[in-house]
Amino acid sequence: MNAEQALRLTNRVMIGFDVALASGALFAPPATLAALGHAEPSPDAEHLFRRCAPIWFTFAAAHALAAARGRPEDWWALAWLRGTELATDIVWSRSRAFERRGSRAALWLAGAANAAMAAGFAWLARK
């Protein structure tokens, strides 16, 4: 598998990941937060997390569009979207509510993954 194939596969995987994350946030926020290592959320934390569902559905749609069309502007849009997520999970990891061992490190890795995807999708846009 070459770099382009790996990036295209990653893009397809992210469609499912973002749909799952958005669906979990919308329909089962406590369970989804628990899967991420979060303590039992307060009602306001549940609603704040639930309001992120449209964001992740938008990410899934952008990934799906790039998978279907593959135009340079689609890849640039994904690079930009993933770039906006570089620090969000790192900032979120500072919450004391992430109690499960490894959950904070996983959020830092999510930031690194977003950086890698942003760079990779930008590369695809220029290819």
PLM regions: where:
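Short amphipathic, positively biased membrane-proximal segments
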Residues: 1-127
